[in-house]
């Protein structure tokens, strides 16, 4: 439950968009040794990290115009989005959902796109 202050539990997602998706995915699998996972509703090559976090490799445009994004896991997504809006932060109007999470994007003061999960 949201208590008026956002509680970030950790980083649950890191993603990158690249024109070299096949090469990057091969590097992640073959050199870094990350196991690939399939999640319904995700249009990226998705890999499992320790602790349950995910790393995604997508084609250009798959991470917004910044090319990369980080997803912060919060205890109450809806409450955290209300808090961002109240602080004047630009929040994507749609809450997305895949087989694992509900999530929403926001643009931080540095101009980059981030995600709450």
Where do the language-model regions lie?
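N-terminal beta-strand motif that seeds the catalytic metal site of vicinal oxygen chelate
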Residues: 1-25, 68-70
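Short beta->alpha transition motifs characteristic of CBS
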Residues: 14-17, 58, 97, 116-117
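Short beta-strand micro-motifs in enzyme catalytic cores
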Residues: 43-45, 68-70, 100-104
């Amino acid at each position: 439950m949201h208590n008026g202050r956002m509680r970030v539990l950790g980083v649950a997602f890191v993603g990158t968009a690249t024109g070299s998706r096949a090469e990057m995915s091969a590097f992640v699998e073959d050199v870094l040794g990350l196991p690939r996972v399939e999640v319904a509703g995700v249009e990226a090559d998705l890999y499992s990290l320790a602790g349950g976090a995910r790393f995604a490799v997508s084609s250009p445009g798959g991470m917004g115009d910044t090319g990369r994004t980080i997803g912060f896991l919060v205890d109450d997504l809806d409450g955290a989005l209300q808090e961002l809006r109240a602080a004047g932060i630009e929040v994507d109007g749609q809450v997305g959902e895949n087989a694992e999470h509900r999530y929403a994007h926001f643009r931080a003061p540095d101009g980059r796109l981030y995600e709450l999960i």
